[in-house]
Structure formats: C-alpha cells, structure tokens
Amino acid sequence: MSVAGRAESLGPPDSFAKRVLVTGGAGFIASHMIVSLVEDYPNYMIINLDKLDYCASLKNLETISNKQNYKFIQGDICDSHFVKLLFETEKIDIVLHFAAQTHVDLSFVRAFEFTYVNVYGTHVLVSAAHEARVEKFIYVSTDEVYGGSLDKEFDESSPKQPTNPYASSKAAAECFVQSYWEQYKFPVVITRSSNVYGPHQYPEKVIPKFISLLQHNRKCCIHGTGLQTRNFLYATDVVEAFLTVLKKGKPGEIYNIGTNFEMSVLQLAKELIQLIKETNSESEMENWVDYVDDRPTNDMRYPMKSEKIHGLGWRPKVPWKEGIKKTIEWYRENFHNWKNAEKALEPFPVQPPFV
C-alpha cells in the first residue's frame, strides 16, 4: 500500500472521531470535497484513495497535503485484495465514492474500461465497505442515468434510461449499490448531480476545455449544432450538497443535486468568448467557434427536480457570473497542473491523453 503525506505523524485509528474514505480524491469534485472536509472537520481523518489516472492531480490538494488529518493512499478500487486490506487497516467509518471514468466522448471508444472501473470497481468497494460495516456509503452518480428529455423533469423515482456507455456504467453501478440496501439494509445513499464546473477539473470537459482553448487562442469545438443544453452547478455548491447528504441523507435514498440555471453549449461558448476575448460582435464570436461531428448520441437536456434535497436544507448559492469568472481566472494560472493537458483540447479524443 503506497502512502504519501504525513502518515508518520498521525495518531492511531481511534484518535479521530471519524475516518472518512474519499475515492478519486485527486480528481475534480472529490478534491474540493477533501479540502472542505480536512479544513472544516479537524477531528475527522480524511483518507484519499486515488490511482492517479491521467485526469487526477495532487496539485488540487496542495493546500491541505500537510494537514494532520489528511492521508493520501495510491491504489485502485478494482484491486479487491488491496481494497479489503485498506478497510481492515484504516478502520473506515464513512465512504464517499467519487472515483470513476467520466469522459463521455471516451466512453464510446473505451466502453469496456468504463464498465470495469465504474461497475466492477464500485462493486468491489461497496462489498468491502459492507464487510467492514461502515456507517454510511455515499455513491456519487450523475443525472445522465435518466437519459435525455425535452420537457419532463426527472425526479428520483424516474426510470433510468442511459444513452451512452458512461451513463450506462453509472446506472449499472447504482444497481449494485442499491442492492446492498435492499438485501442487507447496508446504509447506502446515492446522489445524482447536474454538470459541475469550477477549478480543478481536467480540461476534457466542456467548460474548462472552452476556457483553455480560448486562452490558447484556439477555437471552441462544438459537437453538432451546440443547441444541447446543460445545467451547470459550481463546485463549492455541490460540495455543500454532499455535506448535507452526509449529515442528513437517509439510508437507501437517492438525491438529485440540480440547479435551474441552464445554458446551451453554443451560448456557453459565446459567453466565454465575450469574457475571454472581450468582444460582443456576433461575427467575431463566430470566428472563435468550430463545429465538429457530434457524438454518436448526445442528449438535448437533463431537466431534473431537486425538491428532495431542498427538503434537507440545501440550495445552490454561487451565481453563474461569479462562478465562471473564478473558473476562468483559475485556468489562466493552473492549466499545466496536469501532464500533457494540451491533449485534452482535441475535439473528440479516441485515446487517453496520456498515450
């Protein structure tokens, strides 16, 4: 088991009130989650399990890497022997499972890898957590499991109808997680969130990709017409949602984490062009857009109801204009936090950026 950080200065397992395992903690959303937990819960030991895939960066965690209540372990959730040993040695109380392959474009050409990591890896993890009798297991899923809809809003009881390999793998993993509640009453909670944006996100996803392309004087590559719309939620807001679920979420339940803010991909590109290239001219903005072939499937909308988590007291707080400006500034200074980040800027990658 490879351990990094200040492991030698940590107390025994019982010196902390809780021991929280966060998988995929060097990735985008999970790194924000870890920073929040480490800073706000000094009596909790936060253990980051990450295999450091191409989209991960420990630079996301530099502000807390030397904290006494933080520990990094490099490892793979698909390694069942390793995962079982981790639960035995680290005495985990709570699991926040973020680790996954998430790039939709890549899922079309590497579907088996997505199935292996997202489905098998999740099964390994929830099985080990159940055997270790952890207090709570939160599985981080996606609104994409619902499939697309032009008008009907999805609630937590809506059927899963995924339309791409990534979404299918997340839906399948949900079934394994939920089965542990149904069969054993193992305290699992599932979340499904809208598109999240903000610092720390590897620039293969639409917002950091468009920002990075424009900051490198390259055009925004838009799949198809760009009329597909997405709901965008700022990273700190989704962290607050996970904290709410951690504290108040009921075992066996599913919680949508959404926002009413919705924007088409084309409008997103134009707004970023306005902010980064400082132009309001439609003709000039078109010069910074390049239309490329669409994905094999590309859902038009993911409208989602979030009243259930609102009932727990959570609502998004960060306005779009504030969040996007913070995000633009962060990428101006931190684009090279990942190795070979430039390879993420291609319109339709068919190989992982590290190849």
Curated annotation (Swiss-Prot):
Substrate binds at T142. It is an enzyme of class 4 (lyase). Keywords: Lyase, NAD. It catalyses: dTDP-alpha-D-glucose = dTDP-4-dehydro-6-deoxy-alpha-D-glucose + H2O. Pfam families: GDP_Man_Dehyd. One of its GO terms (biological process) is nucleotide-sugar metabolic process. Its cofactor is NAD(+). The active site is at D143, E144, Y166. One of its GO terms (molecular function) is dTDP-glucose 4,6-dehydratase activity. Its EC number is 4.2.1.46. InterPro entries: dTDP_Gluc_deHydtase, NAD(P)-bd_dom, NAD(P)-bd_dom_sf. PANTHER family: DTDP-D-GLUCOSE 4,6-DEHYDRATASE-RELATED. Belongs to the NAD(P)-dependent epimerase/dehydratase family. dTDP-glucose dehydratase subfamily. This is dTDP-D-glucose 4,6-dehydratase. It comes from Bos taurus. The lineage of its organism: Eukaryota, Metazoa, Chordata, Craniata, Vertebrata.
